From Swiss-Prot:
Organism in which the protein naturally occurs: Wigglesworthia glossinidia brevipalpis
Keywords, sorted A to Z: Cytoplasm, Methyltransferase, RNA-binding, rRNA processing, S-adenosyl-L-methionine, Transferase
Any one GO cellular component localisation term in the record: cytosol
PROSITE patterns: RRNA_A_DIMETH, SAM_RNA_A_N6_MT
Xref: SMART domains: rADc (SM00650)
Pfam families: RrnaAD (PF00398)
Functional description taken from the UniProt entry: Specifically dimethylates two adjacent adenosines (A1518 and A1519) in the loop of a conserved hairpin near the 3'-end of 16S rRNA in the 30S particle. May play a critical role in biogenesis of 30S subunits.
Residues reported to bind S-adenosyl-L-methionine: 11, 13, 38, 59, 84, 106
Protein name per Swiss-Prot or TrEMBL: Ribosomal RNA small subunit methyltransferase A
InterPro entries per record: KsgA/Erm (IPR001737), rRNA_Ade_diMease-like_C (IPR023165), rRNA_Ade_Mease_Trfase_CS (IPR020596), rRNA_Ade_methylase_Trfase_N (IPR020598), rRNA_adenine_dimethylase (IPR011530), SAM-dependent_MTases_sf (IPR029063)
């Protein structure tokens, strides 16, 4: 049996009830083009490969690639790419698929946020994503205004995706047992963005300024870009803090900000 590698964040799903629930939430179909991030020992890979016509798995650990390729329970419709997902040219990778894809995986906690940000650049090639991630990260992604977890990642992810939590998962569902709890989330790209169009690069600058000083009032945290009078002009109370603004508020502000070079 494969010994988990700690530096790769390997914690393998073992709870059969949880595995079944996850597969039911993903609800794979025969014609789906499916991508799995980090198949591990194949807890999800094996049952989904029996349903879907095509599944591409990305796995950094060459020993797991060997294990999966030799597994007699996996059909020959599985294509495994042995590479670090963080080093994969995603634009080139997604362009190899004629149709939009579905993505799932139990993400290593140390790369989950960075990886999801990388997917944003190709969100128009994605049907949906189902990820098992650290519960704390899920809370940050899902958080709404006036919530202590609401921040940069909440605004950016919700600008591009409809996000929802499906279930919480006990750490006992994994082997070895991690120190943190997990959640299964679903992310679907907006077919029509519910927020005003905005210059996303400007919004990122604005969000970093606001949330890096989240306990400060907006009149102080955003003073580099807006006067108090300007903030009021956009129908925002300058005494509010970063966590009090809606995504629409941030869109409107970013569309009117001037970044001095």
């Amino acid at each position: 049996m494969h010994k988990p590698i700690k530096k790769l964040g390997q914690n393998f799903l073992k709870d059969k009830k949880i595995i079944k629930k996850i597969i039911n939430f993903i609800n794979p179909k025969y014609k789906d083009k499916i991508i799995e991030i980090g198949p591990g020992l194949g807890a999800l890979t094996i049952p989904i490969s029996k349903i879907s016509k095509s599944i591409t798995a990305i796995e950094i650990d060459k020993n797991l690639v060997y294990f999966l390729n030799k597994n007699k329970n996996i059909k020959n419709n599985l294509n495994i790419i042995n590479i670090d997902i963080m080093k994969l040219n995603l634009k080139k990778f997604f362009s190899s698929f004629c149709d939009p894809v579905r993505i799932f995986g139990s993400l290593p906690y140390n790369i989950s946020v960075s990886l999801m940000f990388n997917f944003i650049e190709n969100y128009n090639k994605i049907i949906d994503m189902h990820f098992v991630i650290q519960k704390e990260v899920a809370q940050r992604i899902l958080a709404r205004p006036n919530n202590k977890h609401y921040g940069y990642i909440s605004v950016i992810m919700q600008y591009y995706f409809y996000v929802e939590k499906l279930i919480d998962i006990s750490n006992c569902a994994f082997k070895p047992i991690p120190k943190v709890q997990s959640s299964l989330i679903r992310m679907r790209p907006h077919k029509v963005c519910p927020f005003p169009f905005c210059d996303i690069d400007k919004m990122k600058v604005l969000l970093k300024s606001a949330f890096n000083q989240r306990r400060k009032m907006l009149k102080n945290s955003l003073k580099k870009y807006f006067s108090v009078e300007q903030i009021i002009l956009y129908k925002i109370n300058p005494k509010l803090r970063a966590e009090n603004l809606s995504i629409e508020n941030y869109c409107n502000l970013s569309n009117n900000m001037i970044i001095k070079k």
